[in-house]
């Protein structure tokens, strides 16, 4: 399989550390609000990657975190913890907020046929792991204590800008006016590993540590969870493209300084979902969720179909007109598949030929739009019987996950008929 590796800025042959076995870590949601469909594009893409790896023969061990503490509004060390903001907004405890939005996120994943990973671990379940890593970073001189907080010293890691491909001057951007910059750091890009009450005295989630009662920084959480469950050598790390800096950059720095060697070989990032106002974002106040799409009469899998028609690394433009078109195509495809009837033995040669084409498309940097083209070619091919077509659809759908053979997923009403026939 070939994948675009953000670390090297090129498409490369994927070679795992252990033949036939892939260790894959994916950054999970910060559960302070509903996930919008832009967030969910990333999880759809990660789901496709995992299923594609399995389709072409790999065993995959995938881990995802749930960020329920430590993620600041500014994505660095600036502003308040997002969980604290949500707690104030909803007049609930941070734990109640996290539990509710984790449940909502899992429900959205189910509606989009995004498989729940083998291991899903909330950040708050792994405090001892973070303390162990931070202690070693301090002992080895990669971190320092300032105003009671522990920070990673980015000047001690000479490959700090490798993932982003930029330098300090490029990354010095204006700070949002509503966010107070952390003045305890020695250097602008140093980042928090552990915060004590000198950072926020109203933080609800706190734990004892060698440096005082407090809570972990956002970046240490993913490193700690990944190393705990997947070990010291990671094959693939995924996330949205805005995680390249600072989140994934900081993960690499602290992980490699802690381990003393390269940590992850392939970094796979997914493009934004853009609407008429640019990147879809919670900070803008209004955003689309799966529930909103359902309220407007859309099948969530029409959105998955839309994502499958695009290249994962590029931005995807969203509008209701575009989604209308995707839903029409999806429903026509599903109706065509459901019209197929078993009519004899499977043609093994034809099956293997199309199966290999599908694998080739997946191996070509997850070319899912080509996968859909191959599916349509199967349905149009008059030289193969319908039993063979059904078997191919069934296998292809282990990756596409569009419920193409599930009749109970079809809504039969006048609006649907209108959409299909337009």
Where are these regions (language model features)?
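Alpha-helical recognition segments enriched in aromatics with Gly/Pro capping
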Residues: 1-32, 47, 107, 127-341
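Structural preference for alpha-helix termini/caps and helix-kink/transition segments
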Residues: 279-282, 287-422
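Short, glycine/charge-rich beta-strand/loop segments that flank catalytic centers
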Residues: 63-69, 98-105, 115-130, 148-157
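N-terminal, positively charged nucleic-acid-binding surface of large information/translation enzymes
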Residues: 8, 17-113
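Short, well-structured beta-strand/strand-turn elements
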Residues: 59-61, 141-147, 382
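Short catalytic-loop micro-motif centered on adjacent basic/acidic residues
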Residues: 117-121, 237-239, 383
């Amino acid at each position: 399989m070939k994948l675009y590796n953000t670390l090297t800025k090129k498409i490369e042959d994927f070679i795992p550390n252990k033949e036939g076995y892939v260790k894959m870590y994916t950054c999970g949601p910060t559960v302070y609000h509903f996930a919008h469909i832009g967030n969910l594009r990333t999880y759809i893409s990660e789901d496709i990657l995992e299923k594609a790896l399995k389709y072409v023969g790999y065993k995959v061990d995938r881990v995802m975190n749930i960020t329920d503490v430590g993620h600041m509004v500014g994505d660095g060390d600036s502003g308040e913890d997002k969980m604290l903001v949500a707690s104030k907004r909803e007049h609930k405890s941070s734990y109640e907020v996290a539990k509710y939005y984790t449940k909502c996120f899992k429900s959205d994943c189910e509606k989009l046929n995004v498989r729940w990973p083998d291991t899903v671990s909330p950040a708050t379940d792994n405090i001892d792991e973070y303390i162990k890593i931070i202690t070693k970073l301090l002992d080895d001189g990669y971190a320092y204590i300032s105003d009671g907080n522990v920070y990673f010293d980015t000047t001690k890691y000479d490959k700090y800008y490798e993932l982003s491909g930029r330098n300090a001057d490029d990354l010095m951007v204006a700070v949002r006016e509503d966010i107070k910059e952390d003045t305890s750091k020695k250097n602008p890009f140093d980042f928090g590993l552990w915060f004590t009450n000198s950072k926020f005295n109203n933080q609800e989630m706190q734990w004892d540590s060698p440096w005082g009662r407090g809570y972990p920084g956002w970046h240490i959480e993913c490193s700690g969870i990944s190393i705990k469950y997947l070990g010291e050598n990671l094959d693939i790390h995924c996330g949205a493209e805005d995680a390249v800096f600072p989140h994934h950059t900081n993960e690499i720095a602290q992980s490699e300084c802690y381990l003393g060697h390269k940590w992850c070989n392939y970094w796979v990032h997914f493009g934004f979902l853009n609407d008429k106002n640019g990147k879809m974002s919670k900070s803008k106040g209004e955003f689309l969720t799966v529930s909103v799409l359902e309220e407007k009469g859309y099948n969530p899998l029409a959105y998955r179909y839309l994502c499958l028609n695009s290249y994962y690394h590029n931005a995807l433009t969203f509008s209701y007109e575009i989604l209308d078109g995707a839903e029409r195509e999806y429903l026509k495809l599903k109706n065509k598949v459901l019209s197929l009837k078993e009519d004899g033995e499977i043609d093994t040669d034809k099956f293997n030929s199309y199966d290999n084409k599908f694998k080739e498309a997946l191996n070509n940097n997850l070319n899912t739009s080509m996968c859909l083209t191959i599916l349509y070619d199967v349905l149009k091919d008059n030289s193969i019987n319908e039993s063979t077509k059904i078997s191919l659809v069934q296998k292809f759908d282990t990756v596409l996950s569009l419920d193409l053979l599930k009749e109970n997923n079809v809504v039969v009403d006048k609006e649907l008929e209108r959409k299909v026939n337009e």
